[in-house]
Amino acid sequence: MSSPDIMIVFWGNPLYDGRCVNMINQFRDEKLTVKIIGVGKDNETFDFNGAEIKLINRAMLNSSLTKYFKYFKLIKRILKQESPKTIIASDLYSLIPCAQFKQQQKVKLIYDSREIYTQLAGLVNRPIIQKIWSWYEKKYIYSADYVIANAEIDQEYLKNLYPKISIKIFKNLPGSGFLNAKKIDIRDMLCIDRKTKIILYQGKLHNGRGIRFILTCLKHLGDVALVVVGDGPMKKSYINTARKEDVSDKLFFVDSVPYTDLASFSKSADIGVTIIQPISKSYENALPNKLFEYAVSGLPVICSNLVAMKEMVSIYKCGISIPPTDLNAFIEAFNTINKNENNFKIGINLQKELLWENQNKQLIQLIK
């Protein structure tokens, strides 16, 4: 069995992750052999665009006390079997076993710090757990030949923490599928009236994503529906908020869909939203992939006026940024876009510029 050129290790299902999917497609276009280790509902191995994806059953990792140690052990065992030439650790949890493996075998290691993992929203009010993950990152980040970040603000933050790391920026941009996707009739699928405007949120349903705030705004917007595409622990809370605000008839859910299908939903809405609340440093620095996915799909955007997001919509003139808890600002932004939506839709040349394939070509140079 020959060693793969690249192995991507990811604490999640890579088929539902745009960054993993886009990396796979980019590497396969270069005729590189690619294998991916992820976490899913079952133990299974299958092909995706010529790459082999191996999923670990998440039921094996359901103990809060032991799941990460089991994950570390499984990853190191697989890496030893596969002996890849280059490893991309797609999160902090994957960096640890990959760095430990590198101590035993010569291999190129790239740490994809797509978020500030030691400052995640889930670590707010959990200082001991936060210190543990910070210790792990500090211990192993220098094992990486390169660290890659999603935005300049993250690059600066990490460079201040770890001055000697070699860090590059590769933004969370959509693949070309978002440019050429077939449009799903979401109104027909969800029985939404043709005259109803659709606000779209796609992504994980976690605290601090601004969904409850948007639900509060909905009752002031007239004939408007919010379609949420994704899964997560906050779903029940959103349903309760909708009931409390008397907008249950305006809230629609679609379960998570594979990344390759996501563009079809983006094409079918009227406005895309990502009102991230600054409840952690990771959220303060956020430059979410959905922001670019909306823009490339032709959707005007309403987003938080956090540094990276505000800069993005200002540069590309694809939407309006607002204070993330300002109800009147959201309503005004919605009305402004609704009256002049073409002013906030970027042209085809700019859409092409914002594709992963066109902006992240240098990633191949890190691999070779």
Feature annotation, model-predicted:
Residues 229, 236-264:
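Nucleotide-activated donor-binding/catalytic signature segment of Leloir-type glycosyltransferases, i.e.
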